[in-house]
Design a protein with these regions (language model features):
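Phosphate-group recognition and catalysis centered on beta-loop-alpha active-site segments
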Residues: 1-276
Length: 276
């Protein structure tokens, strides 16, 4: 009960009686929507803060606008992360750029604008990271466009080798492979999705059917058996959103490949003590 109530407030909360961790090989620390505890999520300041922390990778979310431009935002609307309201798919880029995406978080970030994919990738070009995890949101139209444009822009910026496209929508992952068989993909799933039951029992089979390179499960699905079977099938495991120290340490013990977290600094500190 304590963990359920306070888990997101106290990331350093540790359950009693936890065993120490073995030394492990490298695990990627991937900042979830940037360092979103310190700056507004999915904005350039959040990703710049991630670089200061020294993460191995970025995770972000991409939507397509009414005029077919790619922008970074988690939700389908801008209601909770800006001073505006409305659906991204029903607005042009110029309309979206009129809104403040920083003040809701702190006056310090007043005037922060929604980043375009191009603006984000220009930052990534300067970054010493190895993982560029772009989650594609299912558009109501232009499904092919959001995938093809993402791949085109990433290639244009010379970042294709770092790219892994993830999505809850299998159609987008299949589309990515059809555009370029070398595009790495990861299937996202969580406990509250209709795919949950099949993924509990048949995650390797589903991954093979979708021809993905990685599984991106909510961390509640992950245990040592899960990771072992995924690795035996040649799949990477990047898990999310891992914030509690107890969960971070569990993921280390399980041997995941990447930890997607709101607390990259905390995760990095734990990993530095227990990896080689």
């Amino acid at each position: 009960m304590i963990r359920a109530v306070y888990g997101n407030i106290f990331p350093l909360f540790r359950l009693p009686g936890e065993r120490s961790l073995p030394k492990m090989s490298h695990i990627n620390v991937i900042s979830h929507r940037g360092a979103n505890i310190y700056a507004p999520q999915n904005t350039l300041p959040a990703f710049k803060k991630s670089l200061e922390i020294g993460v191995d990778g970025f995770e972000t979310d991409i939507h397509i606008t009414k005029d077919d431009k790619l922008v970074l935002c988690h939700n389908y609307t801008i209601d909770s992360t800006s001073d505006g309201k409305g659906s991204i798919s029903q607005m042009t880029l110029d309309q979206l750029k009129n809104y403040d995406f920083g003040s809701y978080f702190s006056p310090k970030f007043a005037g922060t604008r929604i980043p375009t994919m191009e603006e984000f990738l220009a930052l990534v070009e300067t970054a010493d990271i190895s993982v560029l995890n772009i989650e594609l949101k299912s558009p109501k139209k232009n499904e092919t466009a959001i995938v093809s444009e993402t791949i085109r822009l990433v290639k244009e910026h010379g970042l294709f080798e770092k790219l892994i496209i993830s999505s809850f929508d299998p159609k987008l992952l299949v589309e990515a492979k059809q555009i370029d068989q070398n595009c790495k993909t990861g299937f996202l799933y969580s406990l509250n999705r209709k795919t949950a039951w099949s993924m509990i029992r048949h995650y390797v089979e589903v991954a093979k059917r979708l021809q993905v390179d990685a599984l991106h499960p909510q961390n509640i699905f992950v245990n040592e058996k899960y990771v072992y079977e995924a690795h035996e099938a040649g799949l990477l495991v990047n898990t999310w959103t891992v914030n509690l120290v107890s969960d971070i340490e569990k993921m280390i013990r399980c041997g995941v490949d990447g930890i997607i977290t709101n607390y990259p600094d905390v995760t990095k500190g734990i990993l530095e003590k227990h990896t080689y």
